[in-house]
Amino acid sequence: MFKNRYKTEVIDATGIGGSAAACGTAISCGVQTKLCRMAQDVNGRPLKSLAYRLKEQDFKIGIITDSVITDATIAPFFAIASRCHEPEKVISALCRSGFDFFAAGRLSEGNSLPAEKVTESLISAGYRIVPGKKLRTMNPGERNVLLSLSRATKRQPGTPALGDITAGAAGLLSADGKGFLLVVSAGSIDYFNHRNDAASALREMQNFESVIDAALKFASRHPEETLIVITSDHESGELSITGKRATGFHLKQKYTYLEMSDRLVSLNQHKHTDERLIASALKMVHVKNVSDTEHRRLQIACRLFRAHRRLKRYGTYNPLVIEAMRLRDERNGLKYSTFGYTAKHIVTVVYGSGEEHFRSLKKNSDIPGCIAAAAGFPDLMTR
């Protein structure tokens, strides 16, 4: 179905692989910048995003993320900051944005900014806070912030998937017949790839497919007015296919990396043996019948874990969980090469009305200009 695929460069202004903030700025503002700048150029000058520029053209604007609402990938669409972790600045900008719809998995992260304070700020700015299960109670014309754990690895029964939220938001934003921009980010895919948790990453990729399905259904009803752009802020983990992959293996792992690590920490605190810890790790990733060589690898990782030691090959993560997941991945034809970002090109897919404006797409910073041209404003990003 998707014939228009473009190899896309994602390096930052210094020529290295971009971070979430730098790549988010490129995608939202059309400018390559330094690693941790959000909606600022390399000299710290503020940039105006595609979202703000389209809002000035009377477009409705919606922002959805399955992560925290201050996530550095989506924040440059509405906030300006010189560092990635400035949640108060981001929330303040969100409140001033006047955007029509936001949805996120949570309002804050850590103890730097209490969720209660964020809630108060949003309500004072005229936003209605809506729990995920009440997605269908929202009405056109309202300014809503939907709070819902839409991640496949966290979602509870009865709460909407990321695709459901996308469909609901598109319906609200299009109700008055005017144009709209809806940005949907599945940041959890990046989160799990950084931890080399292939099973959880694959589950979240399937969850993101529900977003694409929702977009395609909307496009089928409005074929002359809808443009779908599917891209990535950057590559992380450098996951490669090394052999024939067994289907469905990722569904057997019921716990995420962090949940598995917490369980092993608890077992260790209760003085369980190495063999018990190894057996628990293997059970959680559904690996059976390990060879002597594989068992020795797990023993070394277990000792490192118990001694609180870190080696480069395990990054900052739990060695035993990482080694168990690596054994599982090897059996399923997958392999990670790093825990960090890479400068590898990503693929941008374009479908729908105005897709011809992307033929010259080379860099992620070209994307907002192409979208603006498709919307009928060819010089919007250069004004």
Language model region names:
Residues 25, 32-93, 98-99:
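Extracytoplasmic mature domains of secreted/periplasmic and thylakoid-lumen proteins
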Residues 1-25, 74-383:
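A post-motif C-terminal structural segment
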